[in-house]
Design a protein with these regions (language model features):
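Short, conserved loop/helix-junction motifs that constitute active-site signature segments
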Residues: 101-105
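N-terminal beta1-alpha1-beta2 submodule of the flavodoxin-like/Rossmannoid cofactor-binding fold
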Residues: 1-96, 100, 157-175
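Short helix/strand-capping connector loops at secondary-structure junctions
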Residues: 145-157
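Acidic pyrophosphate-coordinating catalytic loop
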Residues: 48, 117, 151-154
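Fold-independent oxyanion-binding glycine-rich loops
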Residues: 10, 41, 114-115, 149
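A short, flexible beta-alpha/helix-coil linker loop
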Residues: 12, 44, 111, 151-152
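Short, glycine-/small-residue-rich phosphate/pyrophosphate-handling segment
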Residues: 107-148, 162
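Short glycine-rich loop/turn motifs that provide flexible caps or phosphate-binding loops at active sites
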Residues: 9, 88, 109-112, 119-120, ...
Length: 177
């Protein structure tokens, strides 16, 4: 049985570089014969924070397909931008709307950090790793941190061979993880 992969673009911000990086990663996996699902947080129902979480779990018919997708996934890749020293609140809210503990328990994940700063979202990746470990997910130790990301997308495409090589390395590690 083949494993199911889902790539999560970790922001709901329009025109975010995160989605471009997610597409690059998807291409890398595809070139290695891996079929993926792509989850773009911008496509979530705008009211899901109020209509799909906690006592409303399972009641939002527009959100439920995302819950099923995440439950049926074996391996995850989260492309995570740094916002205000951590990761986007939309991503945390999305995670809170998923079935606990079954969504992530004993599954595998990889994290990629993006930042305008020179830290490459180190704190964001640390915070998210703690959350996923709490949820029982095994996180790949190699976490590319793509700093000053805008400089590598001036042409609208990833123009950093170093960053591309980092993503390839992680993808190959994830396939064998």
């Amino acid at each position: 049985m083949s494993q199911r992969y889902t790539l999560v673009c970790g922001t709901n911000r329009r025109d975010a570089i995160s989605l471009h990086v997610t597409e690059v990663y998807r291409t890398i996996l595809s070139e290695r014969g891996v079929t993926t699902n792509l989850l773009d947080l911008r496509k979530l129902p705008p009211d899901f924070a109020f209509s799909a979480l906690y006592e409303n779990y399972g009641k939002n018919e527009a959100f439920n397909p995302y819950v099923r997708l995440m439950l049926e996934t074996d391996k995850y890749v989260f492309i995570v931008p740094e916002y205000n020293g951590s990761f986007p609140g939309a991503l945390k809210t999305f995670i809170d709307g998923l079935e606990y503990p079954n969504t992530f328990r004993n599954k595998k994940g990889a994290l990629v950090g993006l930042a305008s700063s020179g830290h490459g979202a180190s704190l964001a990746l640390s915070h998210l790793t703690d959350i996923f470990n709490f949820c029982g997910m095994h996180i790949l130790a190699y976490k590319p941190r793509l700093e000053r990301i805008e400089e590598s997308f001036k042409t609208g495409k990833l123009n950093s061979e170093k960053y591309h090589a980092m993503l390839v390395r992680q993808a190959e590690l994830l396939i064998n993880f």
